[in-house]
């Protein structure tokens, strides 16, 4: 993850909640910002989620299923 330069210059920090689906085939789809902190931070958080590698999908009764996740991504300057 790369802290956005504009956000760094303006000392912008915050927590972005990103919602996405892991499909039956293990790929990420439908990435969206569920709760915004700042447009620059939002864009970087969504970019990072879109770059996730293929994963093991969730299973119900041994069969792959789609599952929705919402995760927080913290941006803090030190």
Q: Could you tell me what each predicted segment is?
A:
Residues 2-9, 40, 46-78:
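Short, positively biased Gly/Pro-containing turn/loop motifs at secondary-structure boundaries
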């Amino acid at each position: 993850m790369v802290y956005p330069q504009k956000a760094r210059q303006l000392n912008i920090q915050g927590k972005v909640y990103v919602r996405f689906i892991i499909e039956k085939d293990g790929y990420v789809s439908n990435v969206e910002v569920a709760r915004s902190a700042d447009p620059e931070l939002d864009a970087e958080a969504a970019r990072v989620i879109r770059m996730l590698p293929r994963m093991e999908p969730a299973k119900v009764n041994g069969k792959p299923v789609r599952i929705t996740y919402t995760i927080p991504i913290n941006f803090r300057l030190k």
